[in-house]
Design a protein with these regions (language model features):
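Secretory targeting and sorting signals
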Residues: 2-29
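Acidic/polar surface patches and capping/hinge elements
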Residues: 30-625
């Protein structure tokens, strides 16, 4: 990282901001290093130059506001720019934005330089106005300095590697101004207005005009998942127009902005899906009820008993043996309440808040490190060098994630579907829908489920009875669920208790609660399955290296509340297993229903397969833009 003086100079002394055709942004420091001693290999000598830029981009994502759509687009456009800079010097490969073909006496050096200028220009332009721009731009400058590439070389004319990289960046940035994202308008959709008034989280219940449509939340103190304060306490929808963004491999979204349409989610009041709507809200309550670390329930979460699901289901029973070792997977016994909480927090936005697509870049980089140096694209053929592996992997992976964002947000924008907090509070406020003969009947109320969703009565609120703490609320609906955020999350837990349905909240920090966009389909599920498909195709195996991957959440490391009580090691055998758990985590976290998750997995699979097939056409020179 640049010293503070240099970071300040990088912002205060911006002496040249040049826009060429709406695209090429050149930012130069007011100082020039007297000497250049390459330091690229000091920390990670095994990293390719493409990996260095990918890591710098992930750092920028961690600092910025967590908008998955925008960051995924940046990941893809940067990956495509690096691919083009590599492909220029390959006689066969097809470029994505630029189709130049050049030769060089030192192809490896030319590629490194062209890739760096392309990535630097794109990233500087995309993150100059973001939160954390000071640090991010300084890091981008530092990468260039460490590689001995002067950042004041801005020409896009000619055949030098720097000019090639600048020319590619210009093409990328010009393209981005007309790709349907409304970059010039801050990626906003000026035509979108929520149907429902805001749900005030710290007040009971909710008022909804349409219980099937998205409802923004109003929070007293709103902070993004990576800790950035947000001034307006009412959520603004992120990316309703994203289904109209130009894709990598999936079809155009058409006038509706829906590239892949599996049909609508369950709807309250719809003859065919009313019961599914209610049942899936109950499923979220059930998952919430399992977040109790004092329950004493211990479960096995090893790949030997979990995973191997059919696409779009949780019907798997695990893998009989590890195909690498030939041995059964060892049991992995954990506290049930610890599992749900650790799973939710791990998959929230990645361990360092790089958003789901960024998290899958982290996973992919780790896989690459473990496979190196035996890097065979598709799991067969000759081993390739790390740069070729990385630029091809990033093109396929982030092309898939870009399309996953378009597909998922196309459905979010088109169906504008409700989130669980609104569903549960709305139905719970109306009453129960199970028995017209019982009090508080409403056909749009919550179904009664023994020991989970119950009608509060004088008998159940009597001293010592299960609803005693809810005395005075007879006739209302109680749910057994996570009771909310404790005052001190480092030393206390909210616990699982009987609470009023109108007070239900998801297992999230109180300054976030639920993402700022509709539920259907789950972005986590779509991104994760798309990434799993690419990693399976690219590595030639659905299994992680060694047949297993894992993450340990240390005792006491949770952020929402105290816990876990002991170390929890999450495990998965295949990329698909990991992706399914990412989707499932959103139910434990209370921000998606099963329809959001399963549909996301299905359309994510389509995105990933299409991207892998399309990427191979670019590799072989058979792509047609």
């Amino acid at each position: 990282m640049a010293p503070p003086r240099r970071r300040l100079a990088a912002l205060v002394g911006l002496v040249a901001v040049v826009v060429i055709g709406g695209g090429l942004l050149a930012v130069t420091r007011p100082w020039v290093p007297k000497t250049c001693a390459a330091t690229a290999a000091t920390a990670h000598p095994e990293w390719s130059v493409a990996r260095r830029w990918n890591e710098a981009l992930l750092d920028a994502i961690r600092r910025a506001l967590p908008a998955p759509t925008v960051h995924t687009r940046n990941l893809f456009h940067t990956s495509a720019a690096m691919w083009d800079a590599w492909a220029v010097y390959d006689p066969k490969a097809s470029g994505y934005f630029v189709h130049d073909k050049l030769t060089a006496s030192d192809v490896a050096s030319a590629r490194n330089e062209a890739i760096s200028y392309a990535a630097y220009r794109v990233l500087t332009a995309r993150y100059i106005k973001s939160v954390g721009a000071d640090e991010s731009l300084s890091e981008f400058d530092d990468v260039m300095d460490s590689l001995c590439y002067p950042i004041d070389v801005t020409t896009a004319d000619g055949s030098t590697p720097a000019a090639v990289g600048n020319r590619i960046a210009k093409a990328v940035l010009d393209y981005g101004l007309a790709d349907g994202s409304n970059q010039a308008g801050g990626y906003a959709d000026p035509d979108y207005k929520p149907v429902n008034p805001p749900l005030v989280v710290n007040k009971p219940g909710t008022t909804m005009i349409d219980p099937n449509r998205w409802q923004p939340l109003q929070l007293e103190h709103m902070i993004s998942q990576n800790g950035i304060p947000i001034v307006n306490g009412v959520q603004q929808a992120i990316g309703p127009q994203w289904g109209h963004v130009k894709s990598f491999a999936i079809p155009d979204g058409g006038t509706d902005g829906v590239p892949i349409d599996p049909g609508p989610p369950p709807r309250l009041g719809d003859a065919a899906t009313d019961q599914a709507y209610k049942d899936q809200a109950v499923e979220v309550i059930r998952d919430s009820s399992q977040l109790d670390p004092t329950s004493g329930v211990e479960i096995d979460i090893s790949p030997g008993v979990r995973g191997a699901n059919t696409l779009g289901t949780n019907d798997g029973h695990g893998h009989p043996t590890n195909p690498v070792t030939g041995q059964p997977y060892a049991p992995d016994l954990v506290n049930s309440g610890d599992f749900g909480r650790a799973l939710t927090e791990f998959w929230a936005d990645g361990p360092k808040s790089e958003t789901p697509p960024g998290h899958w870049n982290v996973i992919a980089n780790t896989v690459s490190d473990e496979l190196s140096p035996n890097l065979r694209i598709g799991g067969a053929g000759p081993a390739v060098d790390r740069l070729e592996w990385d630029v091809k992997l990033y093109l396929a992976l982030n092309g898939a994630n870009h399309d996953a964002a378009i597909a998922a947000w196309g459905l979010k924008g088109h169906y504008d579907s409700v989130r669980p907090i609104s569903m549960i509070r709305y139905m719970g406020g109306l009453g129960q829908s199970s028995d017209p003969a019982l009090p508080s009947y409403d056909r749009e109320g919550l179904p009664l489920v023994p020991d989970l969703v119950e009608l509060i009565t004088k008998e159940t609120t009597a001293p010592g009875q299960r609803h005693a703490a809810l005395a005075g609320h007879e006739g209302e609906i109680a749910v057994r669920a996570w009771s909310g955020n404790p005052k001190d999350p480092k030393t206390e837990t909210g616990g699982v208790h009987w609470i009023l349905a109108i007070d239900w909240v998801p297992y999230q920090v109180p300054t976030f609660v639920t993402p700022s966009f509709p539920g259907y389909a789950s972005g986590h599920s779509t991104f994760s399955r798309a990434s799993a498909e690419v990693l399976t195709g690219f590595t030639g195996s659905e299994y992680f290296p060694g047949g297993i991957d894992e993450w340990t959440t240390k005792a006491g490391a949770l952020k929402v509340e105290k816990g876990p009580t002991k170390d929890v090691t999450l495990q998965w055998a295949t990329y698909y297993d990991a992706a399914d758990l990412a989707g499932l985590s959103r139910l434990y976290g209370g921000i998606h229903i099963p329809a959001d998750d399963f549909t996301g997995r299905t359309i994510g699979s389509a995105c990933g397969k299409a991207a892998w097939e399309r990427a191979q056409q670019y590799f072989s020179g058979q792509a047609r833009s």
